[in-house]
Regions:
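Structural beta-alpha unit
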Residues: 42, 72-123, 216-260, 274
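A structural preference for short, hydrophobic beta-strand core positions in alpha/beta folds
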Residues: 34, 101-104, 156, 197, ...
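Glycine-rich, Arg-bearing micro-motifs that act as flexible, cationic patches
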Residues: 10, 104-109, 125-145, 248-271
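Structural alpha-helical scaffold elements that stabilize or flank donor/cofactor-binding regions
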Residues: 115-117, 146, 160, 239, ...
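Active-site glycine-rich loop that binds ribose-phosphate moieties when present
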Residues: 136-157, 176-185
Length: 280
């Protein structure tokens, strides 16, 4: 059975993330899986930094104390994870009528997540993580790395979520975007929503083929042509029409590189007030 993987922690995005994952599960009939990765650092993490400046005897005593502390720390972290999973599960069941399954892992969030994700999953991640929220960062440290490294479609969610009725599909003529167009036409998640097919560039005729294809597939499509900066146009169009979801297929190689590593990603992630769906 295909899955929605909700990557949960105690960030301010958690309730919106749960609602978004539940919406996807309802739209697609997928299993809803809550993924919680315990990536805390043990008490002995910095021991190597001080071992060279203390004597052997005191170091041995410190190791014993740290071992006892780490055991307690591990138990507390596991209790925290169990309570968080239970709370979110109960909330999703009460508000959306969906039973969830759980995956708990320990270690680095990105490493553990990438081992779990499958190509046909849809992963949902909050724009803010626990540490980012504490430091008042606009984007979680793991978000861009997660999108870049995940082998499946990823939705990013902020602190609010409303079930979308319309979405923007930012299109450029490329093999990957053509593949994405076909996936949208077949998608249980997107095909019932109004598609705003947005092209930013100097060749408006590029939209003729995807417009015809999506219309023939039964989608309600609104074509739109813009010129200028990619990120600025996507954000402006979304705000003008109050569209609730931005779907980003892949652009050509140079634009993918710029999107994930450059100013386009930063601008969109920091300024978008609606979820982003990045399709692989």
């Amino acid at each position: 059975m295909k899955r929605v993987i909700a990557c949960i922690d105690s960030s301010p995005c958690i309730n919106a993330l749960a609602d978004a994952a539940a919406w996807i599960a309802k739209q697609t009939g997928r299993e809803l899986v809550l993924l919680q990765v315990l990536d805390y650092y043990p008490a002995s993490y910095h021991l190597g930094e001080i071992s060279g400046v203390i004597g052997f005897e005191s170091n041995a005593m410190l190791l014993k104390e740290l071992a006892e502390l780490e055991q307690k720390q591990s138990e507390i972290a596991l209790d925290y994870s169990n309570n968080l999973l239970q709370h979110i599960s109960e909330r999703i069941l009460a508000e959306h009528g969906i039973q969830t399954t759980h995956i708990q892992e320990k270690g680095d969030f990105l490493e553990q997540s990438f081992q779990i994700l499958q190509p046909d999953d849809i992963a949902v991640i909050g724009l803010l993580g626990e540490r980012s929220a504490e430091k008042n960062k606009p984007i979680g440290t793991n978000v861009e790395n997660f999108i870049r490294g995940a082998n499946c479609t990823v939705m990013t969610v902020g602190e609010q979520f409303k079930p979308p009725t319309r979405f923007i599909f930012a299109y450029e003529y490329s093999p990957t975007c053509i593949k994405m167009m076909k996936r949208i036409a077949e998608s249980d998640l997107l095909r019932l929503l109004q598609c705003h097919l947005l092209y930013i560039g100097d060749h408006a005729e590029i939209l003729n083929e995807p417009l015809q294809y999506l219309n023939q597939a039964g989608l309600d499509v609104v074509p739109q042509y813009r010129y200028g900066d990619v990120a600025e146009n996507i954000l402006t169009y979304q705000q003008e029409l109050r569209i609730q979801l931005i779907v980003l297929g892949a652009f050509s190689h140079s634009k993918i590189h710029q999107f994930f590593l450059g100013s386009i990603a930063t601008t969109i992630f920091r300024n978008s007030k609606v979820p982003l769906l990045v399709a692989k």
